[in-house]
Structure formats: structure tokens, C-alpha cells
């Protein structure tokens, strides 16, 4: 295994470019099939643009603790505390179409907006389900790919 610190400071574009450069160097090395682990990378758009064997992240639980839910690659504030804050990530500040999409996903996943506003544990569950939905859509880059969390 090679561990990669892709969660650098900077934009998603910077992290994607760094990850791709790492992949290029590995591909041109004497061991191009080595397994790779991306430390602390939970941003789906970054992971969609690099090829690693595994990754770990705490973004799902951090978002929940800070009053946010994950919807695709967006963090949306829903907690009671954050509702009062004038923030462009607050659900109430989103377009009507996005609000409707988020409310639909909340219902589909078996939650209510009210419980997500009040309960960080429920937000964490919601965020895990968002990640699992994304994982289910992944296509393996190699035959050793394992689509699952191991439990």
C-alpha cells in the first residue's frame, strides 16, 4: 500500500490535480499495480476523479455535528441553530428546486426535516445513507474492487 495525503488545503481542483499526479507517478513506477489509500478524502467529486483502492473520512460525522446533511457533494445546513444563521448553505437559502429535491430525499430515506433539524445522530445516519447511495453507483476500476464497507 501507498498512503496518499490528498486532502491538502486548497480547492477541489487542486486536490484532484494532486491526486492525478500521484496516480501518474505510480502508474509509471516499477509497481504500477500497488494499492493506494487516500487519507481523509470524503469529497465525492475528488474521489470520482482519482483511482484509489481505499479512503477514509470523517466528513459525514463532522457535517452532522455542525448541523449539516450531505446531498451528493453539497453540505446543507438544516439544524435549528444554523437555520437562524444567514448562510448560503442553509436549506432555506437554496433554490426552490433544490429545496424540493432535498425534502424528497429526506422522505425517501425515512427521515423528517424536523428530526434532522434537531438530532445530530439522525443527520449522521442520513449522511451515511448519502455516501452508500454514491458507493452503490461506483464502477470498479479493477478486478480487486470491493463495493462495500466490510460489515
Which residues make up each language-model segment?
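Catalytic beta/alpha-barrel core
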Residues: 1-15, 35-39
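Active-site-adjacent beta->alpha loops and helix N-cap segments on the catalytic face
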Residues: 9-25, 71
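Alpha/beta catalytic cores of nucleotide-metabolism and tRNA/nucleoside-modifying enzymes
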Residues: 24-34, 43-151
Amino acid at each position: 500500500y501507498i498512503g496518499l495525503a490528498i486532502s491538502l488545503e486548497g480547492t477541489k481542483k487542486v486536490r484532484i490535480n494532486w491526486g492525478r499526479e500521484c496516480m501518474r507517478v505510480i502508474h509509471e513506477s516499477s509497481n504500477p499495480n500497488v494499492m493506494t489509500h487516500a487519507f481523509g478524502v470524503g469529497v465525492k467529486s475528488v474521489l470520482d476523479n482519482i483511482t484509489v483502492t481505499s479512503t477514509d473520512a470523517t466528513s459525514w460525522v463532522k457535517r452532522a455535528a455542525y448541523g449539516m446533511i450531505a446531498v451528493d457533494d453539497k453540505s446543507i445546513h438544516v439544524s435549528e441553530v444554523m437555520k437562524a444563521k444567514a448562510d448560503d448553505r442553509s436549506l432555506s437559502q437554496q433554490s426552490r428546486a433544490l429545496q424540493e429535491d432535498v425534502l424528497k430525499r429526506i422522505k425517501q430515506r425515512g427521515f423528517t426535516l424536523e428530526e434532522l433539524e434537531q438530532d445530530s445522530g439522525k443527520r449522521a445516519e442520513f449522511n451515511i445513507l448519502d455516501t452508500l447511495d454514491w458507493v452503490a453507483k461506483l464502477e470498479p476500476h479493477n478486478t480487486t474492487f470491493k463495493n462495500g464497507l466490510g460489515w
